[in-house]
Structures are given as structure tokens and as C-alpha cells.
Amino acid sequence: MPKEMTLADIKELKKAWVSAVRRAIKAGFDVIEIHNAHGYLLHNFLSPVSNQRTDAYGGSFENRIRLTLEIVDLTRKEMPDSMPLFLRLSASDWLDCNPEYKGDSWTVSDSVKLASVLTSHGVDLFDVSSAGNHPMQKITPGPGYQTPFAKAIKEAVGEKMLVGTVGTITSGKQAQAILTGKGEGSMGEQELDLVVVGRMFQKNPALVWSWAEELGVEINVANQIRWGFGGRPGAPKK
């Protein structure tokens, strides 16, 4: 059965976290991303759905974000200044839109507040997802369905932090519309800095090439691959 972490447990967690960050840097990783979403530990501290503590880590918004800020600061302290720090967040528990759920939950407004705080803690990119911590979550899926959350956050933080979106982004044109705030599927006029794509790469490992062709963008492809799709680069056209 899950149990409430003691203050000693939290202290040990932070020590282990720092060790993990050091290992990641030593291993040569280019980016560190803190996973603060989908019902994992830090998300559970943020959300009043799961955080029922009565000490300095529970209750108020400021207390519930305390561990996240401590982890961010510990991580940034170990990282070279040139190394990007990302943070993935569940921007909404998707409970405020379920009339059958009567309690408090983590909302987009909370995420906007947290993002505004994190701009002064060295987070370079906010990777915006949602949900994952309660069976009564009422997700409304569809193309780019989480993008409005990211755009609300970007509108608040402006140029102080990069903001990306994820979820059911399935074409280059859709991604371009989301980023520019223009065209079908843009999900609002606010521009974004990044779309984060995962499952589409499982379907098509050559996704970058496919989307580039869809958008009419020239990219460099290994010669031995391009030979099979129109000839060697630089060869005279017949």
C-alpha cells in the first residue's frame, strides 16, 4: 500500500535525485527532462487530488509546488549552464470538467502559475501534457487536444520560457499550424516553440523526412539512403 513520505524519505529522495543527475551528465546526455506528470511522484505532490499532506509539502499551492522547486533547483545546480533543462507537466488533471467529481484538482490555471514561478528557476522548456492521476479524469481527445493548455501557458510566460505541446499531432501541416498559430488545426492564434512527437515515430521512423516533404522543406539525408529516392545529391538531373 502507498504511504505518505516522511521528511527523511524526501531528504533521501533529493540525495538520490542529485546522484541520478550527475550520472546523466557523466554519461553524456544532451538534455535533462524532469518528469512532473502522469501520476508520477512530483505530479502527486502538485495535485490536491493526491496530496493530502498537512506539513510544509501539502495544503496550499505554495506548499504543494515546494518539492518540484527543490528538485528543479538541485538539478539546475548540477548541470552546466549550457545544458538545457526541460520539465514535463500534466497541465490539468481533467477533473474540473467532470461534474461527477466534487473535489479539488490541478488545473490549467495552476499550471500557468507554476510556469510563471519556474521562469526564475532555470527551466528552459515546459513540455505540456495532461492527466494521469485519477480514474475519474474526463479527457476530451482529438487532434492536438492538449495544445490549448500549452498555449495558455505560453501566453503567460512569453519569451521567458520555451513551451512545447504533445498529443495527437499526426502531420507536418498540423504541427506547423500549431507552432505558427495559423491555419487549420492551429488551436488558437498563440504561437508555440515546439511540438513533441513520440508515437508517430513508432509508425514511421522516417517521420522528419516525411513531414519535411509534406511542408516542402529541404533536409539533409544520408547519401546511401537518398540514392534510392531520386539519385545521389548533386548529380545532374536528366
Please annotate each region the language model reported.
Residues 1-238:
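Flavin-dependent oxidoreductase catalytic cores
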